[in-house]
């Protein structure tokens, strides 16, 4: 088969990897809705979903059937094109961002030299999805929720980026595999970049609009915020997109600060690399859910003040100290 060139084989393998990884991420995001409700019930000493199947295991299927048969309604007063585009961007941008995550030494969708910058670009696109949803709905609660969300996301993305610049300064690369290899050769970044880790996880919770930073969706004030007018599959895309964001941020925490696939016995059992990565990612997913179960929601002004007055100075100090140490080591 002369037409089957090495370049074509590479393209086919990349497409197959992309499909497998993206399907796995979507399935994980959907399953998280059931896992979260079960864990919240366990931690809050109540039942949670327990009617559909053993331990409510088929609750996800029931939810999907219900959502599929709900009317996919678009308000007559909405801007229909932008109204439809918003959930596609919200879910699609986070799915595409997962392409840079190296799952094992040999498995990953894309090995980009601008890996971290690519993540920042995709995370920035979610702001447009929120603004589009709020503005196109032609609803005052949706608009207020989208304004809150965009202001919060932009504020926290500032030090989301700065919190990783210490890692970039030490490694000298934006490539995710280079960062993992540096941790394998030296030490996991949770130790030298502890303050960067703390600020990144705070920013990750805020950017994904998770409790306690779910101000854009504050039910008591804004009646579910920017997706109040959404129903059916469009609302489902926002819903699953939020959980995909949790999986993405958890995978990045595992990769950037805990060595990614690195762990013991990889020389003799290389297949363990996938389980190390999955276990680390799963730990941070559980942490997201625990934060929701245990912390109250602050006021919106407190959320914004915490961003600019506490987290931003902390990331700047961490970056300055890291830069000074890197320069001192070079000399």
From Swiss-Prot:
Keywords: Cell inner membrane, Cell membrane, Membrane, NAD, Quinone, Translocase, Transmembrane, Transmembrane helix, Ubiquinone
KW RNA-binding (keyword) present: no
Keyword Lipid biosynthesis: no
Residues spanning the membrane: 7-27, 81-101, 114-134, 154-174, 187-207, 238-258, 271-291, 310-330
Intracellular or extracellular location(s): Cell inner membrane
Enzyme Commission no: 7.1.1.-
Top EC class of this enzyme: translocase
UniProt catalytic activity: a quinone + NADH + 5 H(+)(in) = a quinol + NAD(+) + 4 H(+)(out)
Recorded GO CC terms: plasma membrane
GO terms under biological process: aerobic respiration
Topology term for the membrane: Multi-pass membrane protein
Pfam entry (one): NADHdh
GO MF, any single term: quinone binding
Chief subcellular location: membrane
Origin: domain of life: Bacteria
PANTHER family, sorted: NADH DEHYDROGENASE SUBUNIT 1 (PTHR11432), NADH-UBIQUINONE OXIDOREDUCTASE CHAIN 1 (PTHR11432:SF3)
Primary role: NDH-1 shuttles electrons from NADH, via FMN and iron-sulfur (Fe-S) centers, to quinones in the respiratory chain. The immediate electron acceptor for the enzyme in this species is believed to be ubiquinone. Couples the redox reaction to proton translocation (for every two electrons transferred, four hydrogen ions are translocated across the cytoplasmic membrane), and thus conserves the redox energy in a proton gradient. This subunit may bind ubiquinone.
Quaternary assembly: NDH-1 is composed of 13 different subunits. Subunits NuoA, H, J, K, L, M, N constitute the membrane sector of the complex.
Family designation: Belongs to the complex I subunit 1 family.
Name recorded for this polypeptide: NADH-quinone oxidoreductase subunit H
Naturally occurring in which organism (per UniProt): Pseudomonas paraeruginosa (strain DSM 24068 / PA7) (Pseudomonas aeruginosa (strain PA7))
Gene name of this polypeptide: nuoH
């Amino acid at each position: 088969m002369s037409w089957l060139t090495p370049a074509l084989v590479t393209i086919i393998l990349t497409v197959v990897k992309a499909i497998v990884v993206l399907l796995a991420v979507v399935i994980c995001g959907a399953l998280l809705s059931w896992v979260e409700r079960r864990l919240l019930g366990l931690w809050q000493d109540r039942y949670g979903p327990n009617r559909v199947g053993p331990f409510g295991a088929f609750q996800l299927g029931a939810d999907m059937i219900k959502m599929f048969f709900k009317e996919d309604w678009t308000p007559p007063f909405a801007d229909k094109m932008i109204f439809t585009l918003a959930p596609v961007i919200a879910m699609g941008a986070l799915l595409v961002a997962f392409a840079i995550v190296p799952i094992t030494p040999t498995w990953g969708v894309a090995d980009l030299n601008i890996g971290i910058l690519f993540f920042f670009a995709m995370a920035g696109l979610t702001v447009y999805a929120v603004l589009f949803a709020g503005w196109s709905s032609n609803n005052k609660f949706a608009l207020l929720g989208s304004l809150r969300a965009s202001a919060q996301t932009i504020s926290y993305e500032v030090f989301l980026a700065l919190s990783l610049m210490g890692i970039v300064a030490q490694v000298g690369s934006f490539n995710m595999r280079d960062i993992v290899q540096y941790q394998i050769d030296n030490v996991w970044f949770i130790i030298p970049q502890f303050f960067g880790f703390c600020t990144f996880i705070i920013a990750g919770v805020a950017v994904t609009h998770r409790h306690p930073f779910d101000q854009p969706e504050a039910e008591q004030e804004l009646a579910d915020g920017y997706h109040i007018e959404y129903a059916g599959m469009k609302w489902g895309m926002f819903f699953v997109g939020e959980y995909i964001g949790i999986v993405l941020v958890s995978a990045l925490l595992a990769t950037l600060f805990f060595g990614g696939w690195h762990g013991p016995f990889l020389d003799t059992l290389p297949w363990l690399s996938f389980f190390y990565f999955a276990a680390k990612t799963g730990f941070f997913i559980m942490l997201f859910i625990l934060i929701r179960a245990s912390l109250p929601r602050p006021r919106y002004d407190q959320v914004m003040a915490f961003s600019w007055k506490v987290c931003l100075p902390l990331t700047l100090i961490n970056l300055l100290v890291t830069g000074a140490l890197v320069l001192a080591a070079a000399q």
